[in-house]
Amino acid sequence: MKILVLNCGSSSIKYKLFDMTTKEVLAQGGIEKIGLVGSFLKLTLPNGEKKILEKDIPEHTAGIEFILNTLVSPEYGAIKSLDEINAVGHRMVHGGERFSESVLLNKEVLDAFIACNDLAPLHNPANLKGVNAVSAILPNVPQVGVFDTAFHQTMPDYAYMYAIPYELYEKYGVRRYGFHGTSHRYVSQRVCEFLGVDPKGKKIITCHIGNGGSISAIKDGKCIDTSMGLTPLEGLVMGTRSGDIDAGAVTFIMEKEGLNATGVSNLLNKKSGVLGVSGVSSDMRELEAAVAAGNPKAILAEKMYFYRIKKYIGAYAAALGGVDIILFTGGVGENQANCRSEVCEGLEFMGVKIDLEKNKVRGEEAIISADDSKVTVAVIPTDEELMIASDTLAILNK
């Protein structure tokens, strides 16, 4: 059983082809700069070698056609024929309240997904382009949608509602939805497998820390709260996003700077966060170098970044009524030891104790808490694509 997983962005398509009998990745890569000058496909060969194939890719259908042709090409192919692809699983960003689990895509489902476009005007239409492209090229292959927001649909209303006039929720669906749900679901399940424990009765805080970041509180395997909101702008300090900010500060800045809604959205989403404070970069590796060189704004940005994560862990420990497992994932969470140690420093009162030697781990599954730590602290690399492929397989087998 071979499943192709697609993640279509506004100008990019990432893909992974899995053989689900072994969960082996047969092929992976991505197209960048769709519709722009200099578009290309970057792929990883089975031996780990990377190749870049340049080609003019005006839109998503041409991109997916290029990917499929590459998958069966004599030189870079992983399969002999496209008939070997049994199904396609799509990362779908915003499923609103309509989707609390992964679904087989049909006209009714896609119409409901299109109705959520207002909530993710950049991402949802791009996801849809991917689905339509596959329908055009492989009309008989079943497609499954896996929603970033679905895992968080178990939050209680008092956690997801905003304290604004209730009719704004009724009219426009303004509430907390949360994102990175497929990642939070994967790592929270995987850490229980890794530790050999039952998710039932466990209180887990999952920290997905990358250029974008979010934290979730998970009780008995279900999400009860998460840091991102109606959009991915709420919560943690991120690479270019502000995270939590007083709404009054937003209107104040709009007046002072003469910004409209688009302008202030651009400021908070693309020019803020670590980049905005440090003036150096949104990349934590570059920020680290600036911190090491003694750059005061970089030092401030890093402290703010770590502090916000720590604050959310404390809040979610309260929401859960304690915590059994704290888990780090995402590009920064998996690879940056100082992020994990700084965040956990001062949490000893909660029973958190890091083993500095164990914490040197990068990008692999590990327990990094000390043997006498009451709370287990773990690193679990996320695998959203495998989760999407697994869901797709489960739906096919229904």
From Swiss-Prot:
Catalytic activity: acetate + ATP = acetyl phosphate + ADP
Residues given in the record as ATP binding sites: 14, 208-212, 283-285, 331-335
Keywords: ATP-binding, Cytoplasm, Kinase, Magnesium, Metal-binding, Nucleotide-binding, Transferase
Gene3D superfamilies assigned: 3.30.420.40
Assembly notes: Homodimer.
Record family assignment: Belongs to the acetokinase family.
GO cellular component, one term: cytoplasm
EC primary class: transferase
4Fe-4S is among the record's keywords: no
Marked site: Transition state stabilizer: 180, 241
Record function comment: Catalyzes the formation of acetyl phosphate from acetate and ATP. Can also catalyze the reverse reaction.
Pathway(s) the chain acts in: Metabolic intermediate biosynthesis; acetyl-CoA biosynthesis; acetyl-CoA from acetate: step 1/2
Cofactor note: Mg(2+). Can also accept Mn(2+).
EC number(s) recorded for this UniProt protein: 2.7.2.1
Cofactor(s) listed: Mg(2+); Mn(2+)
GO molecular function, one term: ATP binding
Record's protein name: Acetate kinase
Principal subcellular localization: cytoplasm
Positions contributing to substrate binding: 91
